[in-house]
Amino acid sequence: MKTHLTIAASKENEMKKVISVYQTQVFIVILSLLILMMALGFNAHAAKLGLASAWLFDDNGGKTVKDVVSGHDGEIKGSLEWVNNGKFGGALEFPGKGDSYVRVDHDDVFNSDPYSFVAWVKLESASWQYVVWRNGDVWPEPENVRHLDIWIHDADYPVFMWHVNGNVGRIDGKTIIADGNWHHIAKIYDGKNVQMFVDGKVDGEAPSGGTLDTSESPIWIGARPGNVAATGLFDEVGFFTEALSEDELNNIMDNGLAGYAPVEAAGKATTTWALLKTKNK
């Protein structure tokens, strides 16, 4: 009788182990499916917004700023310094020298019509600075094709410039942003109008005057030729092939580009940078 009871107990224990293993496997499958659904959702959202490039500035070393969306990596020129006190995770510190900037090679995607450009900056007050430049590697510029051009006036407010059939368009902002604090700056071009957003609010707008002239120039982040450069930190720079709505822009400003730029972790299931980054105030 004892033998039969022992055998029965042993079988019961084995059955419990089998059930436990099965439950664990089911949990892993469900968790993997949830992660995959999140990743696919982020991919779909990113595709909807037309996110073409996202430079998150989390590389923490080296001479390359990775574009986690499409591989338009930026090359670090001069003496930029990696820091860990960005708006979201890491950042690059720019010393205000014209030879120190991030250079991204030309791609036709950057001639998109419409488009949106976004960036977090923490700039010190200085005499004339540059956020982004796209009109060649020399100064004076050989031709007026400022398809993407954002600079900081000597009085510390932002200025947008562009060209249509060689004619210049311009918006002068109202908000001081070179004040040692983090500010989110965005240019939204919908094919007819250009809007300047600072910290999620419209700071200036104007008709574009037509379709913006296109360029085959690289992107310079943090400087332009002729020794005009930024002094401060840059983080979360992104380029979209769509004109973002105000709500979409504010969501990106508040939550970062991470959720729109899923990446493949080495040897692991797809995850998103949104789960890995820390927001700094």
Language-model segments: residues:
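Short strand-turn-strand beta-turns centered on an Asx-Gly dipeptide
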Residues: 197-204
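Extracytoplasmic low-complexity segments
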Residues: 34-98, 250-281
